[in-house]
Swiss-Prot record:
<comment type="subunit">
    <text>Binds to the N-terminal domain of the chaperone ClpA.</text>
</comment>
<dbReference type="InterPro" id="IPR003769">
    <property type="entry name" value="ClpS_core"/>
</dbReference>
<dbReference type="InterPro" id="IPR022935">
    <property type="entry name" value="ClpS"/>
</dbReference>
<comment type="similarity">
    <text>Belongs to the ClpS family.</text>
</comment>
<protein>
    <recommendedName>
        <fullName>ATP-dependent Clp protease adapter protein ClpS</fullName>
    </recommendedName>
</protein>
<comment type="function">
    <text>Involved in the modulation of the specificity of the ClpAP-mediated ATP-dependent protein degradation.</text>
</comment>
<dbReference type="Pfam" id="PF02617">
    <property type="entry name" value="ClpS"/>
</dbReference>
<dbReference type="GO" id="GO:0006508">
    <property type="term" value="P:proteolysis"/>
</dbReference>
<dbReference type="GO" id="GO:0030163">
    <property type="term" value="P:protein catabolic process"/>
</dbReference>
<dbReference type="InterPro" id="IPR014719">
    <property type="entry name" value="Ribosomal_bL12_C/ClpS-like"/>
</dbReference>
């Protein structure tokens, strides 16, 4: 018995499948008047693994523009990062908001 997925002649079957790369989602921090700059930098370095200089640059963008991109990920990872930020902010008493948007 010939199985289509094991037959050497079926290579074209696999190449005909049109796969799209997964959509990308940006994780953004939103500015508020209470969360400290130090806490934002800590989140950026520990949750998003940004270098100190990058974290400071994103923190300043959040502070001056009201919103800053922390990174782009697949949907599941972006939502996990958002959850980590929100839980940590809540635990430490900060009103920091984090959103996920398709980019």
């Amino acid at each position: 018995m010939n199985h289509p997925n094991t037959d050497h002649q079926s290579d074209t079957l696999l190449s005909d499948i049109n796969t799209q790369p997964p959509k990308r989602y940006g994780v953004f921090l939103l500015n508020d008047d209470y969360t400290t700059m130090e806490f934002v930098v800590e989140i950026l370095t520990e949750v998003f693994m940004l270098a100190q200089e990058q974290a400071v640059a994103v923190m300043l963008l959040v502070h001056h523009e009201g919103k800053g991109l922390c990174g782009t990920y697949t949907r599941d990872i972006a939502q996990t990062k958002q959850h980590q930020v929100m839980e940590r902010a809540k635990t430490e008493g900060h009103p920091l908001k984090c959103i996920v948007e398709e980019v």
